[in-house]
């Protein structure tokens, strides 16, 4: 059985997709970009500011589904510029301290709304 998850405290999807889908014990979170859910605007600033907003959006979706950051098992990070990798990691480590999920980081030529970062995640909970 699958369930569509919608978090009020996360940005509304900007296309024909769901914020997240719960399938069994898994939660599949769609790629999140640094949109402030209160204003609907892209967070201006450097990679650190954008990474923080993306992770706050993911956290809000997790919580709406009854999950937490410690339940995240896999993350894919899409970066506009791999030179931002170290700075992104500084913020990322604040969110995933001891509970580090498996992860891939990929440089891409362009992201929606010309943001610097997009992150998607998969969580699992017994």
UniProtKB/Swiss-Prot annotation:
Keywords: Amino-acid biosynthesis, Branched-chain amino acid biosynthesis, Cytoplasm, Detoxification, Hydrolase, Isoleucine biosynthesis. The keyword Amino-acid biosynthesis applies. Disulfide bonds: none annotated. The keyword Hydrolase applies. It comes from the Archaea. Pathway: Amino-acid biosynthesis; L-isoleucine biosynthesis; 2-oxobutanoate from L-threonine. One of its GO terms (biological process) is response to toxic substance. Its EC number is 3.5.99.10. Substrate binds at residue 103. It is an enzyme of class 3 (hydrolase). The record marks 17 as: Stabilizes the substrate. Accelerates the release of ammonia from reactive enamine/imine intermediates of the PLP-dependent threonine dehydratase (IlvA) in the low water environment of the cell. It catalyzes the deamination of enamine/imine intermediates to yield 2-ketobutyrate and ammonia. It is required for the detoxification of reactive intermediates of IlvA due to their highly nucleophilic abilities. Involved in the isoleucine biosynthesis. Belongs to the RutC family. Homotrimer. This is 2-iminobutanoate/2-iminopropanoate deaminase.
């Amino acid at each position: 059985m699958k369930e569509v998850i919608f978090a009020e405290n996360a940005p509304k999807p900007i296309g024909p997709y769901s914020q997240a889908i719960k399938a069994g014990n898994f939660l599949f979170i769609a790629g999140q970009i640094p949109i402030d859910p209160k204003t609907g605007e892209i967070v201006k600033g450097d990679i650190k500011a954008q990474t923080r907003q993306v992770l706050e959006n993911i956290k809000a979706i997790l919580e709406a589904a009854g999950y937490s950051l410690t339940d995240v098992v896999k993350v894919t990070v899409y970066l506009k510029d791999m030179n931002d990798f170290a700075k992104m990691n500084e913020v990322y480590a604040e969110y995933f301290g001891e509970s580090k999920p498996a992860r891939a980081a990929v440089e891409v030529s362009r992201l929606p709304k010309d943001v610097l970062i997009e992150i998607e995640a998969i969580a699992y909970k017994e």
